[in-house]
């Protein structure tokens, strides 16, 4: 079974790893807008990758089922929590969560992947899409402040 999402997830995970490695603590505290900082956005990524991992493990045991969520409400509720996570901890959590879900997706059976695809929710498999949105935003902020990008 072809799994093009594996390469894309890996690419964006490595992009995340490189961004974290070159970001100072000062960089991680930069404001993104609407109350978010770079570190908070990384904690946000960690949360959503961790949620995807929890679902994958549940689905392996119990079968795939829709898991509805009000993402805007969750993100609004998460913001104050993400802001109190120490910046370097948030950055490292983002990498750890990305590694964990990507590994789970790479090792999932073809049958499980097929069941997930039937949900018609691209974000379930293509974790790269969510990472890319936020990494693009973060790199734009860093670039606008002369901190540049190595991607």
Tell what function each PLM region has:
Residues 1-25, 47-58, 129:
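Alpha-helical bundle segments that constitute or directly flank the non-heme di-iron/ferroxidase center
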Residues 15-22, 96, 100-104, 133, ...:
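Solvent-exposed, charged/polar functional surfaces in cytosolic regulatory/catalytic domains
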Residues 7, 74-114:
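Acidic/histidine-rich alpha-helical segments that form the ligand environment
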Residues 2-9, 38, 87-94, 124-127, ...:
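Hydrophobic packing residues in well-ordered alpha-helices of helical domains and bundles
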Residues 1, 26, 79, 85-87, ...:
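Residue-level detector of alpha-helix boundaries and kinks
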Residues 27-73, 110-151:
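Short, contiguous alpha-helical
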Residues 2-3, 14-18, 29-33, 74-79, ...:
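Short amphipathic alpha-helical segments, especially helix-boundary/capping motifs
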Residues 22, 44, 107:
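Conserved catalytic core of Hanks-type protein kinase domains
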